[in-house]
UniProtKB/Swiss-Prot annotation:
This is Large ribosomal subunit protein uL2. PROSITE patterns: RIBOSOMAL_L2. It comes from Geotalea uraniireducens (strain Rf4) (Geobacter uraniireducens). One of the primary rRNA binding proteins. Required for association of the 30S and 50S subunits to form the 70S ribosome, for tRNA binding and peptide bond formation. It has been suggested to have peptidyltransferase activity; this is somewhat controversial. Makes several contacts with the 16S rRNA in the 70S ribosome. Keywords: Ribonucleoprotein, Ribosomal protein, RNA-binding, rRNA-binding. Residues 223-258 are annotated as: Disordered. InterPro entries: NA-bd_OB-fold (IPR012340), Rib_uL2_dom2 (IPR014722), Ribosomal_uL2 (IPR002171), Ribosomal_uL2_bac/org-type (IPR005880), Ribosomal_uL2_C (IPR022669), Ribosomal_uL2_CS (IPR022671), Ribosomal_uL2_dom3 (IPR014726), Ribosomal_uL2_RNA-bd_dom (IPR022666). It holds the Pfam family Ribosomal_L2_C. One of its GO terms (biological process) is cytoplasmic translation. Part of the 50S ribosomal subunit. Forms a bridge to the 30S subunit in the 70S ribosome. Coiled coil: none annotated. GO terms for cellular component: large ribosomal subunit.
Length: 274
């Protein structure tokens, strides 16, 4: 994937960049794998805002992705690489030998016509899914399960990857994109390779309207609000907030750790690096 820039025909165009989408082979998704999702606007079933800065955006259909890769020892051919509006990575449509079709996250360098397979005896090549116990140390992996059979939860966004560092007893140590080293069960499934669309991080949105197309609403600064709306609000003229930075609910921010101790903490071998 490459990045496309524009001539500065307007202020919004001046610094705007966009993907060239050259790896995408079709703009018609597989209808049997599409689902309608209703937009929430960041509200819950009471109609109250539970996630701020969400709303609007282009109408989308959700693509059902196979994160479990539980179709063992049946080869599948890549029939297309497609855009997915619900994620930063591209997705690949697989046609299995028995006729079934499934979408997966498209790893780097996966092309139409390639064959992928999942199972403990699969080759170590991008797109193949294996139990971690069958993957050699040092291998670059993505789409990693945390619970056996639940489906991949780690290293799924564009350009991300994890690395298999060690195996001990029934656990493997995996270095995650954040720098955290974590223990994962050896029987959990992971996919070989790095997630594709690695230039996604270099895309410049360029203008406010493009964020609105993506369903992102403006983030208003606390110091620009009234005292009733935010702890930093109010004051005569422009002020700095008058206290250490806090969230709208008074919890310290900018470096303050809010993660509670939980059972899964014991699986973290090394904390993430800043």
């Amino acid at each position: 994937m490459a990045i496309k820039s524009y001539k500065p025909t307007s202020a919004g165009r001046r610094h705007q960049t966009c993907s060239t989408f050259e790896e995408i082979t079709t703009d018609k998704p597989e209808k049997s794998l599409l689902v309608k999702l209703k937009k929430t606007g960041g509200r819950n079933n009471f109609g109250r805002v539970t996630s701020r800065h969400i709303g609007g955006g282009h109408k989308q259909k959700y693509r059902i992705i196979d994160f479990r890769r539980d179709k063992r020892d049946i080869p599948a051919k890549v029939s297309s690489v497609e855009y997915d509006p619900y994620r930063s990575a591209r997705i690949a449509l697989l046609n299995y030998a028995d006729g079934e079709k499934r979408y997966i996250i498209a790893p780097l360098d996966l092309k139409v016509g390639d064959t992928v397979i999942s199972g403990p005896s699969a080759d170590i090549k991008p797109g193949n899914a294996l139990p971690i116990r069958s993957i050699p140390l040092g291998t670059i992996i993505h789409n990693i399960e945390l619970k056996i059979g639940k489906g991949a939860q780690l290293a799924r966004s564009a350009g991300t990857f994890a690395q298999l560092m060690a195996k001990e007893d029934k656990y493997a140590q995996v270095k995650l994109p954040s720098g955290e080293v974590r223990m994962v069960l050896l029987d959990c499934i992971a996919t070989v390779g790095q997630v594709g669309n690695i230039d996604h991080e270099n895309v410049s949105i360029g203008k406010a309207g493009r964020s609105r197309w993506l369903g992102k609403r403006p983030k208003v600064r606390g110091v620009a609000m009234n005292p009733v709306d935010h702890p930093h609000g109010g004051g005569e003229g422009r002020t700095s907030g008058g206290r250490h930075p806090v969230t709208p609910w008074g919890i310290p921010t900018k470096g303050y750790k809010t993660r509670t101790n939980k059972t899964s903490t014991r699986f973290i071998v090394k904390r993430r690096t800043k």
